A protein has these predicted regions:
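Active-site neighborhoods and metal-handling regions in enzymes and metal-associated proteins
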Residues: 1-127
Length: 127
């Protein structure tokens, strides 16, 4: 049940990030809002890694290179441009495992829309 809640929390972080970008918000604002929600939910020591080795982003653009700019991180004070694609991937990492989501999105004139599954199948798959 604890892992299910962690997944639900990361899906809420994902929805927050997508919501900011959907409205044309800055990538840095998406980071601030997503990180703040994760901290509010108690994940400050496990968001995107474990202290002291946490990554400081929640998503990155995708294109000809695997990781392109802009990034959902501090300092990227610009929106994802129309036609831009981004992998949004909030996760928590613990000593006994990790859980989160990762989907690719495109921003068009109507906002953000998923290119990959984004909930088309059950989020939790146990192996």
């Amino acid at each position: 049940q604890e892992w299910h809640q962690r997944l639900e929390d990361m899906l809420a972080v994902k929805d927050t990030v997508v919501g900011v970008l959907d409205e044309g918000g800055l990538c840095s604002d998406a980071w601030v809002e997503g990180q703040a929600l994760a901290h509010e939910l108690g994940h400050q020591d496990h968001l995107m890694g474990m202290v002291p080795d946490q990554s400081k982003f929640l998503g990155h653009s995708v294109g000809l290179q695997l990781d392109e700019s802009p990034v959902v991180a501090a300092g990227f004070d610009r929106p994802l441009p129309i036609g831009g694609t981004m992998a949004i991937e909030p996760k928590v990492v613990h000593a006994d495992g990790s859980i989160g989501s990762e989907d690719t999105w495109i921003r068009d004139e109507d906002g953000m829309r998923p290119v990959t599954a984004d909930g088309a199948w059950p989020w939790l798959t146990e192996w």
